[in-house]
Amino acid sequence: MSIKYVASSTLPTPWGVFDMHGFEDTETGKEHVALTFGVLDAETPTLGRIHSECLTGDALFSLRCDCGFQLQTAMQNIAEAGQGFILYLRQEGRGIGLLNKIRAYELQDQGANTVEANEKLGFAADMRKYDMILPMMEKIGIKQVSLMTNNPRKVKAMQELGIEVVQRIPLQVGKNRYNEAYLKTKSTELGHMMSEHHFSTDGES
C-alpha cells in the first residue's frame, strides 16, 4: 500500500477549529483524511479515533447505526481535551461500499442481521483494513494513543503496526429503537466491547 500525503487546511466545526490532512492511496485511488486538534506530542498519549466512512450515519443522520453519534462525540471529546486526532478512512459499509451497503440494508429490512446480510451478499462480516493508518500516524506525529473505540480489531491493528495503545476508551453513544438489534449483533457476533447497560430499555444513550 502506498499512502501519499497531499495537503492540509483548517476545518472549522461546531466543536472548534481542526486541521484536516488529506492522503491518497495511490494503488486504489481512495482518499483518506486525518483530523487533528491542538498541538500533538509524539511522546505523550494522544486521544484519538479511527473512524470508517459512513455516509448514511455521518452525513445523512441515519439512526440505523451509531457511527454518526460516535464521530460527533469523538470530535467533542477531542475539543474538550484540547488535543487529539481522528483518522477518517474511506471504508464505507465495513468495506463493502455504499451500494452494497444499501443492498445489505434491504436484506436487513427483510429480517437479516448486519452480519447475515453481508454474508448473503458474498462478503465477510467486516472487510476493513487498517494498514493505511501507519503512514498517516507518522505524518501527524503520533506514537501513543488513547483510543476511543468499542472495536478490539482497531486496538489490535494499531498494536500490530507498532503504535502503542495506552488505553481503550469506550464510545457507547447513539442507541435507539432503530439500531438496538444492530448494536447487539456487533457485540455478540463481531466482538465489540459494549456493556449490557448500553442495551437496556431504560432510556436511550
UniProtKB/Swiss-Prot annotation:
Zn(2+) binds at residues 54, 65, 67. Binds 1 zinc ion per subunit. Pathway: Cofactor biosynthesis; riboflavin biosynthesis; 5-amino-6-(D-ribitylamino)uracil from GTP: step 1/4. SUPFAM superfamilies: RibA-like (SSF142695). Its EC number is 3.5.4.25. Its cofactor is Zn(2+). Coiled coil: none annotated. Catalyzes the conversion of GTP to 2,5-diamino-6-ribosylamino-4(3H)-pyrimidinone 5'-phosphate (DARP), formate and pyrophosphate. This is GTP cyclohydrolase-2. The gene is ribA.
